[in-house]
Amino acid sequence: MIRDFVLMADGERLSVTLFLPAKQPAPCILEALPYRKDDMTASWRPEYERFAAEFGYAVARVDVRGTGSSGGLATDEYQIAERSDLTEVIAWLAAQSWCTGNIGMFGTSYGGFNSFQLACERPAHLKAIVPIYATDDRFTDDVHQMGGARKWLDIVDYCHYMAPMNLLPPVPEIWGDTWRAEWLRRVAENEPWLFTWLAHPEDDSYWRQGSVRPDYERINIPTMIIAGWADGYRNTSFRTVAAINAPTRLLAGPWAHAAPSSSAPGPRIDHVAEMAAFFDEHLRDGETTWELPHTWFCRFSHAPDPVLDTVPGQWRSDSWPSSRSSERKITLADQPTYVVIPDVGMAAWISCAGHLPYGQPDDQRFDDAASITWDIAVDEPLEIAGSVHLLAHVTATCPHPIIAVRLCDVAPDGTSTLVSRGTLLIRPTGEVDVELEATAWQWQAGHALRVSVAGADWPNVVAPGGPGTLTLRGATLTLPIYEPDPSLPVPAFIPGNAKSSEDTEGVIWQIERDVVNRITRCVVGSASTYETPFGTASERYDGWVSVDTRTFEQRAHSDVKFTLRFPEVSATAHSIMDVVTAGDTYEVTMAITVHDGAKLIAEHHWQRSFPRA
């Protein structure tokens, strides 16, 4: 392992960690993240060592500008400057004596986003990408909005914790003697990214910047997408491989926002071997290892379980779009006007979090009972692959109304398992087309397909701005039917870890009801302390969101604390945030303190107001 810096054209330098194979020169694969490669994500090291030792790839890990041990300021996620930086990094890597000049790019979540973004920039040496659990559309399918509706519980998670994380110092041993000056620059000049996101409630040019959709033609290199049906970025699967005009490969499993080799739910597979085979094909002119380009796991009917370890089902392989796909339209009878209940949705998972502490879906009967529902008997196995749509004429009287649609599998014993869901911020009246999240599912004979419609999907997204009703007329459900062919070959995957990486110890995911005051509250939290290559680290996350079911007033509270202990410094960044929405605005207060041991280094206070869409 080698640590180095790449000097940018503007004089800033980016920290890079290199894992080099014994046989050189070799192709290089790049991952670039803001999550501090040398401490907070240093535990990911075994994967990079495997790429080098077992598969002969050089691996480069980079802290993006202003994060970890890289210079500059992290003014926002997915900055235009970040793409310029990484274009320079790719050129630097390609010019090294140990590199063949062929570069691939990969990454989970943030690293998947910028893999897509760099492919759109078309740097000369970038030959293939593998985005994992990422989205092609920053507005419709990220931690910020879902169908235009503000994500709510995510606001106390990533949307907040990046503020204190960005105020932590570079690793002194890596940066050198001026590390404290660089730390103080971060502390003095950074502002929370959340404020920028809240300032853009509509789908405007801000969100198109960094999104692949709708201009997929910008990508002209081979792209392998890894997606998970229990992850929040599952829509970047079928639709994306169908739209990119370059060789594509889809690997979609039952996984949450964790590595396919260790995720719950499984089955778990060795994704590193699959990625290496894909890079072999396009960085080394190797042979194609899959007979068909796309492989996904079709989940079969099963009981709901928030800590499910393994999903029943089968792997499918096919081209996409597939000749075995068709649409089936089902007319849903009109039902009486529905009075919106703001805390419907608690039995479902929290979409973008996708893993503990938020868990997987529980029994949906709790939410079904507070929704409009239609049940359709399933007399023989019924399989779908793709996105379900609900079209209807909707009249809503709530301020800032939404429509939330859930598709469920109801077993003979009455238990209701979530298959997919979709949420859309809507106008007071008009035609709507709600696209549910992509999935692959098979209902067993004797079960029922249930459609549930409500005016809230809380706490996944913010509830409407006040009480009201929802009326649907002329609703039609469109199912993406898939007829499986058992004779089609599927890859022989190497099994992943026998045990998942999810650990419920120390995890909080609680639902509370104040019966007298009619307030529902969801509480989340987790904490950990661990060794790092240069010291120790501690992370603590505590948050809750609430809704008054009479007035629809909603609150969010988040308390996040990071501590990094190096021989030179014990740095702590502690942030407390409160958000209130009770109508047309989000009122945000945030206070951050930064300490060196017991000594206060800086203190920031913000109070901002942002419009609701």
Residue ranges and their predicted role:
Residues S97-S109:
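Alpha/beta-hydrolase fold nucleophile elbow
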Residues I219, I225-A227:
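Short beta-strand/loop motif that positions the catalytic acidic residue
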Residues G112-P123, T240:
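Short glycine-enriched nucleophile-adjacent loop
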Residues M1-K23, V378-E380:
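N-terminal cap/lid segment of alpha/beta-hydrolase-fold proteins
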